[in-house]
Regions:
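Short amphipathic alpha-helices and their capping/turn segments at secondary-structure boundaries
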Residues: 1-6, 128-139
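N-terminal subdomain of nucleotide-sugar transferases
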Residues: 1-69
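Active-site proximal beta-strand in glycosyltransferases
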Residues: 11, 132-148
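A short, flexible beta-alpha/helix-coil linker loop
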Residues: 16-22, 84-88, 148
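A structural micro-motif
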Residues: 49, 75, 137-138
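Conserved nucleotide-sugar donor-binding subdomain of glycosyltransferases
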Residues: 73-126, 130
């Protein structure tokens, strides 16, 4: 694995919930807080780092913009709202139907090639495996071999 200084761009996949959503709203809860704080910690530790966070848009309308820069971190933290029209307002239990669309959109909408892809929850992990093949990059946490 590269040293922290060698890592310039991290992609964070959180398909089922927006890490920056208000806890208690929708599916937002402890995992959201954990992911958001992890992203902030990475940015604090490495002042050269750029992080792109990808989440599925689950609101009734398309987002006003496909991505936004974070007000605190500027261009170092870009939040992507992946819009798959058929997935709008989908329940968490239905999201597996949209994995391929989400994974493909994460690759096509990215602003930078990632050095590392970090995924949370099995849905995001599956999307990260697909993106790993497209980007030729490692995922973190690393996949565990079958039978291990």
């Amino acid at each position: 694995m590269s040293s922290p200084e060698a890592i310039r761009t991290v992609h964070v996949y959180s398909m089922h919930t927006d890490p920056f959503a208000q806890p208690g709203s929708g599916d937002a809860g402890g995992m959201n807080v954990y992911i958001a704080q992890s992203v902030r910690a990475m940015l604090t530790i490495n002042p050269q780092l750029k992080v792109e966070v990808f989440t599925l848009n689950r609101t009734p309308q398309a987002p006003e913009r496909a991505h936004v820069e974070d007000p605190e971190w500027g261009s170092r933290l870009v939040r992507h709202y992946i819009d798959v029209p058929a997935a709008r307002e989908a329940t968490k239990n239905d999201l597996a139907e949209y994995l391929e669309d989400f994974a493909q959109s994460c690759v096509t909408q990215a602003m930078n090639v990632p050095d590392v892809i970090h995924a949370h929850y099995w849905l995001s992990g599956w999307a990260a495996v697909q993106a790993e093949g497209a980007w030729g990059r490692r995922i973190f946490p690393e996949r565990v071999p079958n039978g291990a």
